[in-house]
Amino acid sequence: ATAAARIRRLNEQAEIVVFERSGYISYANCGLPYYIGDVITDPEELTLQTPESFFSRFRIMMKVLHEVTAIHHDRKTVSVRNLKTGEEFEEGYDKLILSPGAKPTQPKLSGMEANKLFTLRTVEDTFKIKAYINNNHPKSAVIAGGGFIGLELAENLRELGMDVTIVQSQKQLMMPFDSDMAAFIHAEVRKHGIHLVLGHKVEGFIEKDGGVNVLLSDGTSLPGDIAVLAIGVTPDTHLAKEAGLELGVRGSIVVNDRMETSVPDIYAAGDAVQVKHFV
């Protein structure tokens, strides 16, 4: 959406079409846990723009619930599936921008198909967790991952009265912070009644006694009514790979200083691309 808006500002005449496989085009990820915790009660407050408002402002066609399934750079088209109707069609392009973003990291662990195991990345994920809580009233949760989303979710589940445990493979939360600063975070989190299990790696999940047990590398397990996997994200680049684009670190899309990929007239931006770190 950001790239599309910028193109419109540079070119008032260009025909711009955006395909988005989810039902939402612009939302604040860090606000999602606060909808689960009832701090945000109106779901419309999660979104910054709608397809209608975006078209009204920028004259850009935003086709939500449309998934691009293939790129044909030899004839400069993409294959698209309408997720509501099942219709499939091809759309031509002069220039193509890939911005698939990132998906929750899903390690190859046993029990990943457990019904009470969730991830939190999209608005749809948020509604799924919220609906489960409203319908089943879980009393406890285990969150795997101690980054921003994991901590915000822990805060909100605790506010709902749930017993919350965070398990982290490293020996501190918030790895970008120095250990002495992380110590203050640990103290604050524990002060609010959240349990920390640090330096323990998750090895799998098993549904048991109406809940889910999170299996740890030391042979122990953490029981919860639900579990949430929040261990980071991975570039979502399967389309680029299938189209033959050059990939780099962790499967990210390689681009030059102009954000051009290895294929002419295809650009890429966002969480899916490889960038230079100048520090």
Regions found by a protein language model. Name each.
Residues 1-65, 154-177:
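Beta1-alpha1 glycine-rich phosphate/pyrophosphate-binding loop at the start
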Residues 1-2, 23, 102-104, 124, ...:
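Residue-level detector of alpha-helix initiation sites
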Residues 13-15, 57, 63-84, 91, ...:
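A Rossmann-like FAD-binding core segment of flavoenzymes
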Residues 18, 119, 143-144:
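Hydrophobic Val/Ile/Leu positions in short beta-strands of Rossmann-like dinucleotide-binding domains
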Residues 73, 79-80, 87-140:
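Glycine/serine-rich phosphate-binding loop and adjoining beta1-alpha1 elements at the start
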Residues 80, 98-99, 143, 229, ...:
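Redox-cofactor binding/interface segments in oxidoreductases and associated redox assembly factors
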Residues 113-137, 213, 220-279:
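FAD-site-proximal beta/loop scaffold in flavoenzymes
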Residues 124, 128-177, 211:
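Rossmann-like NAD(P)H-binding beta-loop-alpha module
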